[in-house]
Curated annotation (Swiss-Prot):
It is found in: Cytoplasm; Cell membrane. The lineage of its organism: Bacteria, Bacillati, Actinomycetota, Acidimicrobiia, Acidimicrobiales. It comes from Acidimicrobium ferrooxidans (strain DSM 10331 / JCM 15462 / NBRC 103882 / ICP). Monomer. NCBIfam families: era, small_GTP. This is GTPase Era.
Protein backbone atom coordinates (compact mmCIF):
# COMPACT_ATOMS: atom_id res chain seq x y z
CA UNK A 1 0.00 0.00 0.00
CA UNK A 2 1.23 3.50 -0.89
CA UNK A 3 1.90 5.42 2.36
CA UNK A 4 -0.25 8.27 1.02
CA UNK A 5 -3.23 5.90 0.66
CA UNK A 6 -2.89 4.32 4.11
CA UNK A 7 -5.36 5.19 6.87
CA UNK A 8 -4.11 7.64 9.50
CA UNK A 9 -2.25 6.14 12.45
CA UNK A 10 -4.49 5.89 15.51
CA UNK A 11 -2.38 3.54 17.65
CA UNK A 12 1.37 3.37 18.13
CA UNK A 13 3.87 1.96 20.56
CA UNK A 14 6.86 -0.21 21.35
CA UNK A 15 6.90 -3.96 22.00
CA UNK A 16 10.12 -5.27 23.56
CA UNK A 17 10.81 -8.79 22.28
CA UNK A 18 12.67 -10.62 25.05
CA UNK A 19 13.95 -14.10 25.81
CA UNK A 20 17.05 -16.16 26.50
CA UNK A 21 19.77 -16.39 23.87
CA UNK A 22 19.14 -18.25 20.63
CA UNK A 23 15.36 -18.76 20.89
CA UNK A 24 14.61 -17.14 17.52
CA UNK A 25 13.69 -13.61 18.58
CA UNK A 26 15.24 -11.94 15.54
CA UNK A 27 13.63 -14.40 13.13
CA UNK A 28 10.28 -13.77 14.80
CA UNK A 29 10.72 -9.99 14.56
CA UNK A 30 11.52 -10.29 10.86
CA UNK A 31 8.45 -12.47 10.31
CA UNK A 32 6.18 -10.09 12.21
CA UNK A 33 7.58 -7.13 10.27
CA UNK A 34 7.31 -8.96 6.96
CA UNK A 35 10.89 -8.23 5.96
CA UNK A 36 14.51 -9.05 6.79
CA UNK A 37 15.32 -6.22 9.15
CA UNK A 38 17.51 -7.74 11.89
CA UNK A 39 20.45 -10.11 11.53
CA UNK A 40 19.83 -13.78 12.11
CA UNK A 41 22.10 -16.76 12.68
CA UNK A 42 22.06 -19.96 14.70
CA UNK A 43 24.71 -18.58 17.06
CA UNK A 44 23.70 -17.35 20.52
CA UNK A 45 24.00 -13.60 21.13
CA UNK A 46 23.80 -12.76 17.43
CA UNK A 47 21.88 -9.61 18.41
CA UNK A 48 24.27 -7.19 20.10
CA UNK A 49 22.20 -4.04 20.10
CA UNK A 50 18.54 -3.18 20.36
CA UNK A 51 17.04 -2.85 16.88
CA UNK A 52 13.72 -1.10 16.36
CA UNK A 53 11.70 -2.40 13.43
CA UNK A 54 8.71 -0.32 12.38
CA UNK A 55 5.71 -2.11 10.91
CA UNK A 56 2.38 -0.62 9.86
CA UNK A 57 -0.62 -2.84 10.66
CA UNK A 58 -3.84 -1.17 9.52
CA UNK A 59 -4.16 2.05 11.51
CA UNK A 60 -1.45 1.02 13.99
CA UNK A 61 2.28 1.65 13.98
CA UNK A 62 3.90 -1.35 15.66
CA UNK A 63 7.52 -0.82 16.71
CA UNK A 64 9.16 -4.17 17.49
CA UNK A 65 12.31 -3.86 19.61
CA UNK A 66 14.61 -6.84 18.98
CA UNK A 67 16.73 -7.15 22.11
CA UNK A 68 19.89 -9.16 22.86
CA UNK A 69 19.30 -12.58 24.39
CA UNK A 70 19.39 -12.88 28.17
CA UNK A 71 22.40 -14.84 29.45
CA UNK A 72 24.76 -14.80 32.40
CA UNK A 73 27.17 -11.85 32.24
CA UNK A 74 30.75 -13.12 31.83
CA UNK A 75 32.47 -10.03 30.38
CA UNK A 76 31.89 -6.30 29.90
CA UNK A 77 30.02 -6.87 26.62
CA UNK A 78 27.48 -9.33 28.03
CA UNK A 79 26.94 -7.09 31.06
CA UNK A 80 26.17 -4.16 28.77
CA UNK A 81 23.80 -6.23 26.67
CA UNK A 82 21.85 -7.16 29.78
CA UNK A 83 21.55 -3.50 30.78
CA UNK A 84 20.28 -2.65 27.30
CA UNK A 85 17.57 -5.28 27.58
CA UNK A 86 16.48 -3.88 30.94
CA UNK A 87 16.34 -0.34 29.55
CA UNK A 88 14.32 -1.32 26.47
CA UNK A 89 12.01 -3.48 28.55
CA UNK A 90 11.34 -0.66 31.01
CA UNK A 91 10.60 1.80 28.19
CA UNK A 92 8.28 -0.41 26.12
CA UNK A 93 4.49 -0.37 26.10
CA UNK A 94 4.40 -4.17 26.03
CA UNK A 95 6.83 -7.04 26.44
CA UNK A 96 6.68 -10.18 24.32
CA UNK A 97 8.40 -13.15 25.95
CA UNK A 98 9.65 -15.69 23.40
CA UNK A 99 10.03 -19.30 24.55
CA UNK A 100 11.57 -22.04 22.38
CA UNK A 101 9.18 -25.01 22.13
CA UNK A 102 12.12 -27.43 22.18
CA UNK A 103 13.80 -25.97 25.26
CA UNK A 104 10.58 -25.25 27.11
CA UNK A 105 10.32 -23.23 30.31
CA UNK A 106 13.58 -23.30 32.25
CA UNK A 107 15.12 -21.21 35.01
CA UNK A 108 15.87 -18.34 32.62
CA UNK A 109 12.28 -18.24 31.36
CA UNK A 110 10.93 -18.31 34.90
CA UNK A 111 13.23 -15.43 35.83
CA UNK A 112 11.97 -13.36 32.89
CA UNK A 113 8.33 -14.33 33.42
CA UNK A 114 8.51 -13.12 37.01
CA UNK A 115 9.12 -9.60 35.69
CA UNK A 116 6.23 -9.59 33.21
CA UNK A 117 3.16 -7.45 33.78
CA UNK A 118 -0.43 -8.69 33.30
CA UNK A 119 -0.59 -6.61 30.10
CA UNK A 120 2.39 -8.45 28.57
CA UNK A 121 2.31 -11.38 26.14
CA UNK A 122 4.14 -14.70 25.65
CA UNK A 123 4.67 -16.84 22.56
CA UNK A 124 5.90 -20.41 22.21
CA UNK A 125 8.03 -20.28 19.06
CA UNK A 126 9.55 -22.88 16.71
CA UNK A 127 6.53 -25.13 17.17
CA UNK A 128 7.29 -26.81 13.83
CA UNK A 129 10.20 -28.59 15.55
CA UNK A 130 8.14 -30.46 18.15
CA UNK A 131 4.98 -32.52 18.44
CA UNK A 132 1.75 -30.73 19.28
CA UNK A 133 1.62 -32.35 22.73
CA UNK A 134 4.97 -30.75 23.56
CA UNK A 135 3.75 -27.33 22.44
CA UNK A 136 0.64 -27.63 24.59
CA UNK A 137 2.70 -28.69 27.61
CA UNK A 138 4.99 -25.65 27.29
CA UNK A 139 1.97 -23.41 26.77
CA UNK A 140 0.29 -24.80 29.89
CA UNK A 141 3.38 -24.09 31.96
CA UNK A 142 3.56 -20.53 30.64
CA UNK A 143 -0.12 -20.03 31.41
CA UNK A 144 0.70 -20.25 35.12
CA UNK A 145 1.94 -16.67 34.75
CA UNK A 146 -1.02 -14.26 34.48
CA UNK A 147 -0.58 -12.47 31.15
CA UNK A 148 -2.84 -10.71 28.67
CA UNK A 149 -2.50 -13.43 26.02
CA UNK A 150 -0.51 -16.51 24.98
CA UNK A 151 0.38 -17.52 21.42
CA UNK A 152 2.13 -20.28 19.50
CA UNK A 153 4.03 -19.54 16.29
CA UNK A 154 6.38 -20.89 13.66
CA UNK A 155 8.46 -18.63 11.47
CA UNK A 156 9.16 -21.50 9.07
CA UNK A 157 5.51 -22.37 8.39
CA UNK A 158 3.97 -19.00 9.21
CA UNK A 159 1.56 -20.51 11.71
CA UNK A 160 0.41 -18.00 14.31
CA UNK A 161 2.37 -15.06 12.88
CA UNK A 162 -0.60 -13.07 11.59
CA UNK A 163 -2.60 -13.66 14.76
CA UNK A 164 0.28 -12.46 16.93
CA UNK A 165 0.92 -9.42 14.72
CA UNK A 166 -2.74 -8.40 14.76
CA UNK A 167 -3.00 -8.79 18.51
CA UNK A 168 0.12 -6.75 19.23
CA UNK A 169 -1.05 -3.96 16.94
CA UNK A 170 -4.53 -3.86 18.47
CA UNK A 171 -3.10 -3.77 22.01
CA UNK A 172 -1.06 -0.61 21.45
CA UNK A 173 -2.13 2.61 23.15
CA UNK A 174 -3.87 5.31 21.14
CA UNK A 175 -1.42 7.80 19.71
CA UNK A 176 0.04 9.34 16.55
CA UNK A 177 2.76 7.91 14.35
CA UNK A 178 6.21 7.84 15.95
CA UNK A 179 8.14 7.65 12.66
CA UNK A 180 7.81 9.15 9.21
CA UNK A 181 5.90 7.10 6.64
CA UNK A 182 8.12 4.57 4.88
CA UNK A 183 10.70 4.24 7.68
CA UNK A 184 11.16 0.53 8.42
CA UNK A 185 14.27 0.44 10.61
CA UNK A 186 15.45 2.78 13.36
CA UNK A 187 19.19 2.20 12.99
CA UNK A 188 22.01 4.45 11.70
CA UNK A 189 23.12 3.45 8.21
CA UNK A 190 26.73 2.82 9.31
CA UNK A 191 25.53 0.49 12.06
CA UNK A 192 23.27 -1.31 9.60
CA UNK A 193 26.13 -1.87 7.15
CA UNK A 194 28.41 -3.16 9.92
CA UNK A 195 25.69 -5.55 11.10
CA UNK A 196 25.12 -6.92 7.59
CA UNK A 197 28.85 -7.62 7.23
CA UNK A 198 28.92 -9.32 10.64
CA UNK A 199 25.93 -11.47 9.70
CA UNK A 200 27.70 -12.67 6.56
CA UNK A 201 30.76 -13.62 8.62
CA UNK A 202 28.53 -15.59 11.00
CA UNK A 203 27.11 -17.54 8.07
CA UNK A 204 30.54 -18.26 6.59
CA UNK A 205 32.47 -19.05 9.78
CA UNK A 206 29.81 -21.10 11.57
CA UNK A 207 31.20 -22.16 14.98
CA UNK A 208 34.78 -20.93 14.61
CA UNK A 209 34.70 -17.48 16.27
CA UNK A 210 31.27 -15.79 16.20
CA UNK A 211 31.53 -14.11 19.60
CA UNK A 212 35.08 -12.84 19.06
CA UNK A 213 34.18 -10.84 15.95
CA UNK A 214 32.90 -7.27 15.68
CA UNK A 215 32.49 -4.91 12.73
CA UNK A 216 32.63 -1.13 12.54
CA UNK A 217 32.39 1.34 9.66
CA UNK A 218 35.59 3.41 9.83
CA UNK A 219 35.04 5.71 6.85
CA UNK A 220 32.21 6.54 4.43
CA UNK A 221 32.28 8.48 1.18
CA UNK A 222 30.63 8.31 -2.23
CA UNK A 223 33.68 6.35 -3.40
CA UNK A 224 33.44 3.60 -0.81
CA UNK A 225 32.74 2.36 2.70
CA UNK A 226 35.57 0.88 4.78
CA UNK A 227 34.56 -1.66 7.41
CA UNK A 228 37.03 -2.77 10.08
CA UNK A 229 36.57 -6.36 11.24
CA UNK A 230 37.87 -6.84 14.79
CA UNK A 231 39.04 -10.16 16.22
CA UNK A 232 40.85 -10.92 19.48
CA UNK A 233 43.76 -13.15 18.38
CA UNK A 234 46.14 -13.37 15.38
CA UNK A 235 44.94 -16.94 14.81
CA UNK A 236 41.39 -15.61 14.45
CA UNK A 237 42.56 -13.11 11.86
CA UNK A 238 43.80 -15.99 9.74
CA UNK A 239 40.36 -17.66 9.98
CA UNK A 240 38.55 -14.48 8.97
CA UNK A 241 40.85 -13.98 6.00
CA UNK A 242 40.64 -17.60 4.89
CA UNK A 243 43.04 -19.35 2.54
CA UNK A 244 44.39 -16.74 0.12
CA UNK A 245 41.79 -14.29 1.44
CA UNK A 246 38.85 -16.29 0.13
CA UNK A 247 36.60 -15.99 3.19
CA UNK A 248 37.04 -12.22 3.36
CA UNK A 249 36.36 -11.89 -0.37
CA UNK A 250 33.26 -14.08 -0.21
CA UNK A 251 31.85 -12.12 2.73
CA UNK A 252 32.48 -8.82 0.95
CA UNK A 253 30.72 -10.04 -2.21
CA UNK A 254 27.69 -11.33 -0.32
CA UNK A 255 27.39 -8.22 1.84
CA UNK A 256 27.76 -5.95 -1.20
CA UNK A 257 24.99 -7.88 -2.94
CA UNK A 258 22.66 -7.08 -0.04
CA UNK A 259 23.92 -3.50 0.13
CA UNK A 260 23.90 -2.71 -3.58
CA UNK A 261 22.33 0.72 -2.93
CA UNK A 262 25.45 1.66 -0.93
CA UNK A 263 28.99 2.59 -2.10
CA UNK A 264 31.55 -0.21 -2.67
CA UNK A 265 32.69 -2.04 0.45
CA UNK A 266 36.27 -2.53 1.62
CA UNK A 267 36.92 -4.90 4.54
CA UNK A 268 40.01 -4.71 6.74
CA UNK A 269 40.78 -7.18 9.55
CA UNK A 270 42.37 -5.92 12.76
CA UNK A 271 43.43 -7.72 15.95
CA UNK A 272 42.22 -6.01 19.13
CA UNK A 273 43.00 -8.26 22.06
CA UNK A 274 40.12 -8.98 24.45
CA UNK A 275 37.95 -6.22 23.00
CA UNK A 276 34.86 -7.72 24.68
CA UNK A 277 36.37 -6.91 28.08
CA UNK A 278 37.45 -3.37 27.21
CA UNK A 279 35.03 -0.58 28.14
CA UNK A 280 36.95 1.79 25.86
CA UNK A 281 36.65 -0.50 22.83
CA UNK A 282 32.99 -1.19 23.48
CA UNK A 283 32.36 2.56 23.66
CA UNK A 284 34.12 3.00 20.31
CA UNK A 285 32.01 0.23 18.80
CA UNK A 286 28.82 1.77 20.15
CA UNK A 287 28.12 -1.29 22.28
Amino acid sequence: MDPDDAPPIRRSGFVAVIGRTNVGKSSLVNALAGERATIVSRHPNTTRRSVRVISRVGDAELVLVDTPGIAAAHDELSARLRRWVDDEWDGADRALLVVDAERGVGARERELASRLKPSDVAVVARIDRVRRARTLAVLAELAQVPLAEYFVASVRTGEGIEELRSYLASSLPEGPALYEAGVALDLPRATYVAEVVREEFLHHLRDELPQALACQVESWSDDGVEVVVYVERPSQRAIVLGHEGRVLAAVRRQAQRRLRAYPPLTLRVKVQRDWRRSARMLDELGL
